[in-house]
């Protein structure tokens, strides 16, 4: 049975956004609000009793130049593993959009997305980060880490703007965090999984092979990208909203030198920030979890207000149930583009897929979409089981859902 998240209370925040360079600043408005719903529990539910994990600042990071946008220290949340998972490590890269110009990076540095001064001192560990076997059957007793995201460039930039007092040091944050975790035991890991959601899911794809090289040859190392398959596709006006955004990020934050050279040897740097141009070249096993009708991409790169001045897409972008037949056909075309983007990638036995026909975004950290009694399924397999089967080589997993509206197990996000 489909479960809808009725989110009318945040519609105003989603619709009212500042515009910069001709498109909505969705990187600090809409995506934040979508990802703030990541836990998948009602706080008033009797079952809402998640593990709370404290923030650790990386004390040696400053001397390495590894700092947030505002110059504060980066951080992570670590919950130690035990028993059979004591020597296994799961690193979750936080998502949260991007900043592509001075104006919205200055705005961002006054939030948890750009400064550890504003980060929560404790956060909930749910879904793939849960410490309960009944909620997270394969990874509950691993060392589980959530690396906070405060650089605005998917852990890939290395530059600065002195006039605006902005530090774009995502690549150095990544390295400093890995060094710190290695010193805390990760260097001896028998098993490791790098995962991430949204902008963190993109970072997984960018950093996966580098992550593999941190370990000895006998360590099982794989990567999981959740809602990170951002497509280089035109918006409803024929414009290039997301390409313009990514070009700004790459240029402003000095990302070029930190992109995979196999890609930049034949494509421009902005193209090499798009996962579709990277995934087939990766050497490390990768699992992709993505909604075929990714709600962030619908709202912010396919049909943002800047590409829809007449408001024709307004109702559809907030509630798929209000889309016209023509709009649904357009979204089916987007799904087809996504499937074409993973066609070569899926031919490799080492890789895995879970692409469900839902209007969702980030399904691995939400408890209700990761593993629960009514979780989304494809061929009766929930996301958690699919990922576990793939990681532990219990089965080859290439799960692609039938087109909307066939899947009644979706937990669709509805904003009105």
Swiss-Prot record:
* One Gene Ontology biological process: cell wall organization
**InterPro entries recorded:** PAE/NOTUM
Superkingdom assignment: Eukaryota
Q: What keywords are assigned to this protein?
A: Cell wall, Cell wall biogenesis/degradation, Glycoprotein, Hydrolase, Secreted, Signal
Query: What top-level class of enzyme does the UniProt entry assign?
Result: hydrolase
Q: Which residues form the signal peptide?
A: 1-20
Q: Name one GO molecular function term.
A: hydrolase activity
Cellular component, GO, one term = extracellular region
Q: Where is the active site?
A: 198 (charge relay system), 294 (charge relay system), 361 (charge relay system)
- E.C. numbers: 3.1.1.-
Q: Which residues are glycosylated?
A: 27
Q: Which family does it belong to?
A: Belongs to the pectinacetylesterase family.
Function statement: Hydrolyzes acetyl esters in homogalacturonan regions of pectin. In type I primary cell wall, galacturonic acid residues of pectin can be acetylated at the O-2 and O-3 positions. Decreasing the degree of acetylation of pectin gels in vitro alters their physical properties.
Protein name, entry field: Pectin acetylesterase 10
Q: Which organism is it from?
A: Arabidopsis thaliana (Mouse-ear cress)
Organism taxonomic ancestry:
Eukaryota, Viridiplantae, Streptophyta, Embryophyta, Tracheophyta
